[in-house]
């Protein structure tokens, strides 16, 4: 990364960082896509089981990753402020937190989740598939969190092409393992939907292996000496990471868990509706890679400019990110509307299920426009390390507004589609409030056009 002067130079740097991130995100989300489609091709019960299992894993995955991603703006600001020597300790303390969280999460999976599954409104077969799916995921939870720290470290330096290469190397391996474990090919046990969990868990370890190799062989990464001895646990650094990470993680948790809650509530409408909801939701997740990548890019660039005390440049990057996100939202909405029948065909050959999926996809268009506004705002706020209010806004918007609206509409002629209208309502409310917040945050940051000093 480097300082830029013109809008043209900023667009170029934005796209240089954004493009590898979006390829990485699309590839990562394709793992969920292939888990869903390959499980659906095995059976509707397998698809429903993976949907329920994912409804547990997705919010935890996203929330804990969001917590660990706190090192991205921290390191980006350190780089901008020319304090590179502090980077190694930041990464190490992030790894300490990651391993602790992994241990806690594995305990919860084996001690708490089975009890929850027995009380859910789904068949015993679907619950059993979900349980084994999550057990498979647990194999790779430590690796997943370690890789989240390493990926954040690499991205915060603006070296997003490296994480792209890591992901591109590992996802084909995941697809191959899905083929083996779900369908029992090449002498592997036929595990159905649960097999996709084991495939994903094993793949996470490959991600760590490839990450370590690249960090050790790339000069721009090796110079930080991340793997040259362990630094001491610093409670001040732990406090900084948690101070940013917890609100950030809660924001993501409130957003992803609301989708998981809706998946569980869909159980009242039957297995077929759960399967259709999960299929359409996996498409939305895939498309969400674009606005999410805009947010990640703004966190990196905004953090870098904030560390260098250049508020004007940080604001200009936010404007660029907003323009890019709105354009992406329009394109994604058009894809969902005009190609919904083709998309549904990827998931099932059942006409009734295909019709349900197409209906969900129409309502998903609303998500695209809400995310186009919300994602860049969240990314900018993370770059400024202003994340406390976002978690409060997320809880109110999603759980106190979005879910009640959706629940009420589900008793009308809209049925299960009412939940998706409720979800969209929550996203729009959050986007509106946080758009005001980011402007106020920028007003509070005092910068001198030359030396610039930030005051919070």
Curated annotation (Swiss-Prot):
Keyword Transport applies: yes
Residues spanning the membrane: 13-34, 54-76, 95-117, 132-154, 161-183, 193-215, 244-266, 286-308, 321-343, 358-380, 387-409, 414-436
Coiled coil: none
Membrane topology recorded in Swiss-Prot or TrEMBL: Multi-pass membrane protein
InterPro entries to which the protein is assigned, alphabetical: MATE_fam, MATE_MdtK, MdtK-like
GO annotation terms (biological process): monoatomic ion transport
Database matches in NCBIfam families: matE
Annotated signal sequence range: none
Name of the protein: Probable multidrug resistance protein NorM
GO cellular component: plasma membrane
Keywords: Antiport, Cell membrane, Ion transport, Membrane, Transmembrane, Transmembrane helix, Transport
Family stated for the protein in its record: Belongs to the multi antimicrobial extrusion (MATE) (TC 2.A.66.1) family.
Keyword presence, ATP-binding: no
MF-aspect GO terms: antiporter activity; xenobiotic transmembrane transporter activity
Cellular localization per UniProt: Cell membrane
Role played: Multidrug efflux pump.
Pfam families, sorted: MatE (PF01554)
């Amino acid at each position: 990364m480097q300082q830029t002067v013109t809008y043209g130079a900023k667009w170029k740097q934005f796209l240089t960082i954004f493009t590898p991130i979006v390829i990485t995100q699309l590839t990562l989300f394709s793992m969920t896509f292939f888990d869903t489609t390959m499980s659906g091709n095995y059976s509707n019960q397998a698809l429903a089981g993976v949907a329920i299992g994912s409804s547990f894993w997705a919010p935890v995955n996203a929330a804990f990753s969001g917590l660990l991603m706190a090192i991205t703006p921290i390191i980006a600001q350190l780089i901008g402020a020319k304090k590179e020597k502090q980077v190694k300790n930041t990464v190490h303390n992030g790894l300490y937190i990651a391993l602790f969280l992994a241990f806690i999460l594995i305990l919860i999976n084996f001690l708490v989740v089975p009890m929850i599954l027995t009380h859910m409104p789904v068949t015993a077969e679907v619950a059993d598939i979900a349980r084994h799916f999550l057990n498979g995921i647990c194999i790779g939870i430590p690796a997943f969190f370690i890789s989240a720290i390493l990926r954040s470290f690499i991205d915060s330096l603006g070296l997003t092409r490296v994480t792209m290469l890591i992901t591109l190397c590992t996802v084909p391996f995941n697809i191959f393992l899905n083929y083996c474990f779900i369908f029992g090919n090449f002498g592997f046990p036929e595990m159905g939907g649960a097999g996709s969990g084991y495939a994903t868990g094993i793949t996470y370890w490959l991600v760590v292996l490839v990450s370590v190799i690249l960090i050790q062989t790339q000069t721009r990464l090796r110079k930080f000496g991340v793997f040259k001895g362990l630094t001491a646990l610093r409670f001040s650094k732990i406090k900084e990471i948690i101070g940013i990470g917890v609100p950030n993680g809660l924001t993501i948790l409130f957003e992803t868990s609301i989708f998981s809650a809706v998946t569980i509530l869909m159980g009242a409408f039957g297995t077929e509706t759960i399967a259709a909801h999960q299929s359409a939701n996996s498409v939305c997740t895939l498309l969400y890679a674009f606005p999410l990548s805009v947010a990640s890019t703004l966190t990196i660039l905004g953090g870098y400019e904030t560390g260098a005390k250049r508020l004007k440049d940080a604001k200009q990057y936010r404007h660029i990110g907003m323009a890019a996100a709105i354009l992406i939202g329009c394109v994604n909405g058009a894809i969902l509307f005009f190609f919904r029948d083709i998309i549904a065909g990827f998931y099932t050959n059942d006409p009734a299920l295909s019709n349900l999926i197409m209906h969900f996809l129409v309502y998903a268009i609303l998500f695209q426009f809400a995310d186009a506004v919300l994602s860049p705002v969240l990314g900018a706020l993370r770059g400024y390390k202003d994340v406390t209010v976002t978690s409060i806004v997320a809880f109110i918007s999603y759980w106190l507004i979005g879910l009640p609206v959706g629940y009420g509409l589900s008793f009308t002629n809209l049925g299960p589609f009412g939940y998706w209208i409720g979800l969209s309502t929550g996203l729009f409310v959050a986007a509106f409030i946080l758009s005001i917040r980011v402007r106020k945050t920028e007003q509070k940051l005092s910068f001198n056009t030359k030396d610039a000093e930030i005051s919070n």
